[in-house]
Amino acid sequence: MESDKKIADNRHRIFKRMQKIGTAISFVNANNTHSGNLSMRDPVDPDVFYITASGSQGGHLIQQDIVPIHFSGVSWGDARGSTESTIHREILKIPGVNSVIHAHYMHSTFISFDTKDKQLFLRFLGTDSHEREEFLFYPVDLIGAYSIGGVKVGSYEQPVGSSEMEERIPQSLGESILTIVRGHGPFARGSSPENALHYLSVLENSSMLAIFLRRRGIDIGRIQKSIMDLGKNKFFPVNPAISEINVTPRCEINDPSILEDFRIKLNYNYRQSIGAFGTGSMSHKISSKEMIFCSMSAVPENFEFPLCRTTISFQEDDSLDLRLHKLIYQNTHQNSCMITSSPLATAEGMAILAEEYGMGVLLDGGTKIPYLAEDHPVVKPIDGEAIYLNPRVGLVDMSQLADMTPDNPILNMLRWYKGCCIVAGFAVISTGEATLEQAAHNAASAERIAKFRSEVFINEKLLDGPAVEVFEPK
């Protein structure tokens, strides 16, 4: 009896965890009602993994939707495992892999519609022995480049539940954490379901950024080539040192009101795609020497998140994000800070810098941009609410991330433009003089500003509409 209870309790824990992942995927519309699948290795029985049933509704999983399957291939239970169970089984045999997720993220799938004759987002690698085209997607943003790196994209004669998928996808995921089936969607593997979700979320963020950059007239192929030729450690000015998701993160804060304040912002940023899950950061200054810091700015509902007290003075092992928070608190009167991957705002910042200073600013880091009070780049809103609240948003190039001195122009941008600065190719840094709410408002506003600008730009180019500049505040 006790043994049966342990087995039942273990299966229930697995179900709740997979249910949480499925709900998180549905929140960002990464699947239709019944598409995609996810699996997880049984942490107790090494011969068993669990997978969502064929035809199950990923955003509303019930216990019967989680099907246990032996690695030997014999399954049991009331429901039938996903049609891609064999693919999951082979991927889960890779050392260190405990979970696989396949989802139909819109932007991650959209970038896959390239051909060997025309590439908008991908680098053509060649064809295999069966003349199937193979490509590589390389993120051009700092977070994507370091979190996931290059992602292989394969074309398939039958891209759903086929024997060629069973053969090639596990092979691709033996070499990388992600792969994309052209026209179908990405697969991710992870040491946990949470980590697999993190990789998919970052891929979607980087894909969205790449699409908006391309639609703004920026040749991302040149940027991708430069990154791959130089290597990311030479191309980018800093290493963000992004770590894996900790399934049981450390939380030092017990105050329910503080926890709820952070949770609301984290959940909102994830749902609205203002940040990729597990990236970014947010904090609140509680004294001249201390702050409460969260090493994420986007987390799905019902997920745990890290929260700790830390000193405002620099420490040797500080991450890039943490150093930025400390730099801001040391040199401004701001009392809250949020860093969000913000794909649209980050892309718009890159496009504006390229338009004003040439493509070199995105390629070689040799272009020097002035950051004088009377001469510096900005992003100008065109929508009424943003113009009323903040008629300019600060903008800097990514090289400023290497400067941790009081002369960093990010600080002046936050002073001059009501606590909002876009770091092109990295993130939006938003702050508040009093509450975390103010920083959250700035982050959300920056993403909407970029969306309006991009859509009007597309209307101008495709529909002969008025130019963006017509609506910019004078």
Regions found by a protein language model. Name each.
Residues 1-474:
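Glycine-rich flexible loops
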